[in-house]
């Protein structure tokens, strides 16, 4: 067995926000048919990978609230890659956690993708991006997005990706109550109970929605056109049932230089966009005490052109 014991890799694993989330219908496999725009932001976790020759995946973290066992997506990703590649050695992995858990920012999915990318390099497997995306899709619907990163159209259950040729430079303020989490599965179930009569099954109609997002999605996010809007269908469910989300959206809507605001994913994190990161920083400085007094953690972020990166 080749001795790679001293080889280490460090990776930045960024969060995402949804700039568009449209629930179109229900697929035969039980997943929902979606049309989304996802964007990486610079709120990120950091992972360190080191080869071990014991054939074991050992995960440690500075986050006490995180399971480090086989149900963790990092461990699942590593074991899947080992099985796929039929290798004998393992890895020691350390996760420095900054992205809040259960927040609608897909920190776990980002970590899973970072693990596939990192171990592909560490173990010198030379798997191409298409293969990594295929593996990622078996682990979770939005993990393939993180293999590619940046800003992307995401269709199907989230695994069908189309790169958007654009660089958005907005700043963002994120708010999340640290004591509140939202179950993604429960949110989709509640949405389906309320709106299943509006679901589409006709493939041509579904493709028309995809085409409309391709043609107009960026225009809706272009401040120069003074037409900045964000759609999140799941917000219709979560906002009505979660006072923390409702209050966060209200607080963000009242910020002086806010361009638009929304919930990310299935929540409960909410965000407001500003013309640049500096403007967002000033707004957070002016309102940080208010946010804290209302029970929210807050972050200032900007958009990333790329997703997971080696550091």
Swiss-Prot record:
Pathway recorded for this protein: Isoprenoid biosynthesis; isopentenyl diphosphate biosynthesis via DXP pathway; isopentenyl diphosphate from 1-deoxy-D-xylulose 5-phosphate: step 3/6
Binding site for ATP: 100-110
UniProt cross-references to InterPro entries, sorted A to Z: GHMP_kinase_C_dom (IPR013750), GHMP_kinase_C_sf (IPR036554), GHMP_kinase_N_dom (IPR006204), IspE (IPR004424), Ribosomal_Su5_D2-typ_SF (IPR020568), Ribsml_uS5_D2-typ_fold_subgr (IPR014721)
Reaction catalyzed: 4-CDP-2-C-methyl-D-erythritol + ATP = 4-CDP-2-C-methyl-D-erythritol 2-phosphate + ADP + H(+)
Source organism superkingdom: Bacteria
Gene Ontology biological process terms, A to Z: isopentenyl diphosphate biosynthetic process, methylerythritol 4-phosphate pathway; terpenoid biosynthetic process
Keywords, in A-Z order: ATP-binding, Isoprene biosynthesis, Kinase, Nucleotide-binding, Transferase
EC identifiers of the protein: 2.7.1.148
GO-annotated molecular function: 4-(cytidine 5'-diphospho)-2-C-methyl-D-erythritol kinase activity; ATP binding
Active site: 16, 142
Enzyme class: transferase
Alphabetized PANTHER family for the sequence: 4-DIPHOSPHOCYTIDYL-2-C-METHYL-D-ERYTHRITOL KINASE, CHLOROPLASTIC (PTHR43527:SF2)
Known role: Catalyzes the phosphorylation of the position 2 hydroxy group of 4-diphosphocytidyl-2C-methyl-D-erythritol.
Family that this chain belongs to: Belongs to the GHMP kinase family. IspE subfamily.
Protein name per the record: 4-diphosphocytidyl-2-C-methyl-D-erythritol kinase
UniProt lineage: Bacteria, Bacillati, Cyanobacteriota, Cyanophyceae, Synechococcales
Gene name for this UniProt entry: ispE
